[in-house]
Amino acid sequence: MNIRFYNARILVPSEGHSFQVITGELWVKKNEIIYIGDGLDTERVFEKEPAGMILWDREIDAEKNLLLPGFKNAHTHTAMTFLRSYADDLPLQDWLTKQVFPKEALLTADDIYWLSILGIMEYLTSGITSNFDMYFFPETIAKASIDCGFRTMQVSSFNDFTSSIEEMEEIYHKVNEMSDLTGYVPGFHAEYTTSKEHLKQVAALSEKLHAPVYFHNSETALEVEQCKERYGMTPTRLMEELGMFQYGGGGYHCVYFEDEDFEIFRKRNLTAVTNPASNLKLASGIAPIDRFIKEGINLAIGTDGPASNNCLDKIGRAHV
């Protein structure tokens, strides 16, 4: 489909990390933006067309509207749409072990396919055009995204109870070869669901593939406390000691950080993905965003899954 937006205010990137707003037109040909400008320099576009012109399927007067680049949802579990608003009154550990994990054990690949498509439909209503997903049946999730024309990067949810490191490597190659719309990187669910031996395997695979690693990190005070009891250090320090960050990556939530955790993230150029609405629902706490900014650490925002957030609205999460 060929679409022309005109009379629009358009937010476009400029030098550095800044943006500017221009007034003009935005043209979409099939699935590609082919022009953004004031509409006075379109000859260069027409010159590339075989017929010297473009037949529009739709022309939209966008006066008094602002066109924005698509949002990226930096952390989510899309297919958890089936658990939306489920068990709203429990802290994270009870919520996971008593309510979520038993329900997830019943899911099939076909369930994941249709639940993923349902989630993608919701993403599009708030301008989300790509996501960083973590869930089961990654090849099925990739197929759902491809069928919808949606861009999905996935990270492994590897832990002590599902799959193997060999399967993670196999899926890495399969998903990364499926389409330009899909990708996959090594990772694991969290320190508290993954033994030290398995964590070492993830670090070794990251080294072998030269790939970054992502995981749920320091989401609750209990998680950090128990990790210290097991290993005498925070989850971030443990992963650093295991060589997990040689090729970058990051953590989801990052609510309970100590001074050395900030230093490791800064030194390794890691990304802290905040999930404010999810952390509030599960009474986990509030991430120290001001400290991340002060330290110059990469920051991103995710919705988390719809079960721990109750929606997949990126704008609403940024507002929180």
Question: Where are each of the predicted segments found?
Answer:
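Divalent metal-coordination and catalytic microenvironments
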Residues: 8, 26, 31, 64, ...
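Hydrophobic faces of well-ordered beta-strands that scaffold small-molecule active sites
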Residues: 70-74, 131-132, 152-155, 184-188, ...
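Alpha-helical scaffold segments that flank or form the walls of functional sites
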Residues: 84-149, 169-178
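Active-site-adjacent C-terminal substructures of enzyme catalytic domains
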Residues: 194, 244-319
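Conserved N-terminal beta-strand of ABC nucleotide-binding domains
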Residues: 2, 23-26, 59, 63, ...
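N-terminal metal-binding scaffold of metallo-dependent hydrolase/deaminase domains
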Residues: 1-48
